[in-house]
């Protein structure tokens, strides 16, 4: 039924005005409780049915998140990850909530880092994820292995997921660009399917952080560096200046294009959390981002028609109206 309704709604855009009356009746007969708002290129409403009735928007929420991000951060915005080195060659890594630290990006990151600090062995790695509170939780995220339930983090790689292949007890990477690490092997052996699959890191934020550290170390070694000490967590010492700042190679506009194309919940809420962190200062929080979002929606007269609980649509507490969404798309 819904596919028929979509086709009919699209066809309305090509109808002459005198034919619209009959089309409205067909829409009402096909889906009397459906929400329909068809508009022409000038914003004139052609067919209206339940346009002010709130609905659960699901992944349509990502459109609002993308609009908010462009308004607050700007299309040229780039996420940053900062690196610090103390006198004992302990490397501190401070995550900045980059949603797109995929393996290809880590290869670029490691190359720039090794060029900046040299190839002398590092005596340890300390991961600082304090930009995100350790107890941050997104409404609707559940404790499953599904990629759409991946936890958000100040420092996570490959969308806080592991993509691997399991044959019996043997685990290998499913991607030539991604080295396999000890944590990836143990996690996928315990929770991954036989054959090829992807699991999210949801049980414990420390697990995803450890995986990020292991994968960064693997790429440092690929770039010609080496790490002799262990991976731990902690804060960057006060007064220590960054020796290297990695700026994401993708602009926000490019990341948002990937977000909307793949409907990635993890990216959506990383971006949503940055909206509040950027405008109100870190650490990030859902409350800060909701405050900024609600203020911006209110300024546009959309406070009553767009209600957000998070930025991806995974929460069923989000509520939109068709007219509110249409008005936002016209801005």
Q: Where are the model-predicted features located?
A:
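Bacterial N-terminal signal peptides
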Residues: 6-14
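Beta-lactamase-like hydrolase cores
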Residues: 15-57, 73-79, 112-121
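Conserved serine DD-peptidase/penicillin-binding transpeptidase domain
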Residues: 23-25, 71-303
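Extracellular-facing binding/remodeling surfaces
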Residues: 44-47, 302-311
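A short glycine/serine-rich beta->alpha loop
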Residues: 49-55, 202, 312-315
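Active/ligand-binding-proximal structured segments within catalytic/core domains
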Residues: 56-69
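C-terminal soluble interaction/assembly domains
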Residues: 292, 307-331
């Amino acid at each position: 039924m819904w596919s028929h309704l979509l086709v009919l709604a699209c066809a309305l855009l090509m109808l002459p005005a005198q034919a619209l009356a009959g089309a409205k009746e067909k829409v009402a007969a096909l889906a009397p409780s459906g929400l329909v708002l068809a508009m022409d290129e000038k914003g004139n409403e052609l067919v209206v049915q339940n346009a002010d009735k709130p609905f659960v928007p699901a992944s349509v929420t990502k459109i609002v998140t993308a609009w908010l991000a462009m308004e607050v951060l700007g299309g040229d915005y780039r996420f940053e990850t900062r690196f610090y080195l103390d006198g004992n060659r302990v490397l501190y890594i401070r995550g900045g909530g980059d949603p797109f630290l995929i393996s290809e990006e880590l290869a670029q990151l490691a190359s720039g880092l090794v060029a900046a600090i040299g190839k002398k062995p590092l005596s340890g790695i300390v991961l600082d994820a304090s930009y995100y509170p350790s107890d941050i939780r997104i409404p609707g995220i559940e404790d499953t292995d599904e990629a759409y339930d991946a936890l958000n983090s100040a420092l996570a790689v490959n969308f806080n997921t592991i993509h691997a292949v399991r044959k019996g007890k043997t685990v290998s990477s499913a991607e030539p660009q991604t080295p396999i690490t000890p944590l990836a092997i143990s996690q996928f052996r315990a929770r991954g399917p036989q054959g090829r699959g992807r699991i999210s890191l949801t049980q414990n934020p420390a697990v995803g952080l450890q995986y990020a550290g292991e994968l960064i170390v693997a790429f440092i070694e690929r770039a010609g560096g080496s790490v002799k000490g262990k991976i731990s967590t902690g804060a960057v010492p006060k007064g220590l200046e960054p020796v290297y700042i990695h700026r994401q190679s993708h602009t926000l506009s490019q990341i948002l294009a990937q977000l909307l194309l793949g409907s990635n919940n993890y990216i959506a809420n990383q971006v949503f959390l940055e909206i509040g962190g950027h405008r109100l200062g870190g650490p990030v929080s859902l409350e800060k981002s909701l405050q900024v979002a609600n203020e911006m929606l209110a300024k546009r007269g959309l406070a009553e028609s767009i209600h957000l609980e998070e930025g991806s649509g995974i929460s069923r507490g989000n509520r939109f109206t068709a007219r509110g969404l249409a008005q936002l798309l016209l801005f």
